[in-house]
Amino acid sequence: MTALRALICVLALALAPGAANADTARIAVASNFTSAAKALADEYAALSGHAITPSYGATGALYLQISQGAPYAAFLAADQARPALLLQDDRAVPGSGFTYAIGELALFSRDAAAVLGPDYLKQAPFERIAIADPATAPYGLAAMQTLQSLGLDAVLAPRIVRGKNIGQTFQFIWSGAAEAGFVARSQIADAGAGAHWTVPSSLHEPIAQDAVLLDASSVAARGFLAYLRSPAGRATISRHGYATPE
């Protein structure tokens, strides 16, 4: 059976009117994907009757929870490495991994008059700049790679404040705890104010985000992952500021 036919079959089972009893699945979701995941969960629930309960956090922290037995039915990471490790360690359903979104990094300031870009970082007209923890958050790692590419990582190190995930990092900027910081471009659309610079992908490694199924018995989780790959799901992901794989 081809991947496309398998996807159609899973969606047909999950979305069929009156199909089985309504199921609920707890899903681990990288913080940067919060808004998109909420929209996708609502759409999927309306179509299928199945409920998706997302739990948000840094990819590394969620991976650790899953490795220690946390009862998630699926994992939407902000990288490819952690889902691959779960597959390698037989903690995920074989063959279930796929790239659901490709993210973009942005430098963001709540000050709409700020002119952001490499010169802003070099001139450093700020006391604090926020990034997510590079050890656990892929967008934080991409931020550090950007500073390294610009030769500014050592110079700016004393001014860096680290959020435990990209959601907290955004809050640092929005609250004024940091004048600027690196976030997911998708978060900026929800802000409705401020200035931003979309970081060229040449300055950091690609932010390909993979999903993996953890509980093969979860009808809701299997259907939800299939929905992410459907035309409707991909359109929602695109509307929230992500590219989707061909």
Where are these regions (language model features)?
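N-terminal secretory signal peptides that target proteins for export/translocation
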Residues: M1-A3
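Bacterial N-terminal signal peptides
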Residues: R5-A16
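Short, flexible coil/linker elements and helix-boundary hinge sites characteristic
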Residues: A16-P17, G49
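Sec/Tat signal peptide C-region and signal peptidase I cleavage site
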Residues: G18-A22
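Exported/periplasmic ABC-transporter solute-binding proteins
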Residues: D23-S55, G60-Q68, F75-Q80, A84-D90, ...
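Basic, amphipathic juxtamembrane/active-site segments
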Residues: P94
